[in-house]
């Protein structure tokens, strides 16, 4: 009803509505966590039964009953990537490293180590273990990924394409979040 197309492109009305909902939900929220150890402890101890998380935490949880679900509304996510500084002294070496880490075997090993979907899905067909990992993290499920909005820093230029309104900035989000947590 608010016309939100991208959760990282909220105008003031949309941000205000989101903050109002979060404040309303404070009565049913057990805790907000900001670090992985606190989150794993909360799930493992039974204090938390549902929440947003990083996929890697499932790998380290003592109880293997942590599962991932994708809400019908979609979810947020992020992509890890290598970046090359404009001031790097060894550009060719940097690009060679990026080429190497993008190969199916290396990218897949990184994905398995960190508990995430590989970017190079050629990895999935390399072994039964690789395919099981790709299945667990929906690596080849295009419909799944269409519902995941990649993380981006909120800025005033709306990244969802709207031109008739100013979106809210990261600082505005930070200030609003402080009112939720108290």
Residue ranges of predicted features:
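Conserved C-terminal helix/tail region of periplasmic/extracytoplasmic solute-binding proteins
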Residues: 146-182
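Short helix-loop capping/hinge motifs at secondary-structure junctions, enriched
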Residues: 2-10, 87-94
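Periplasmic solute-binding protein
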Residues: 1-3, 79-83
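Mature extracytoplasmic/periplasmic domains
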Residues: 76, 85-151
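Ligand-binding pocket segment of bilobal, Venus flytrap-like solute-binding proteins
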Residues: 1, 7-69
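Venus flytrap/periplasmic-binding-protein-like
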Residues: 69-77
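Non-transmembrane alpha-helical segments in soluble domains
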Residues: 19-23, 40, 44, 52, ...
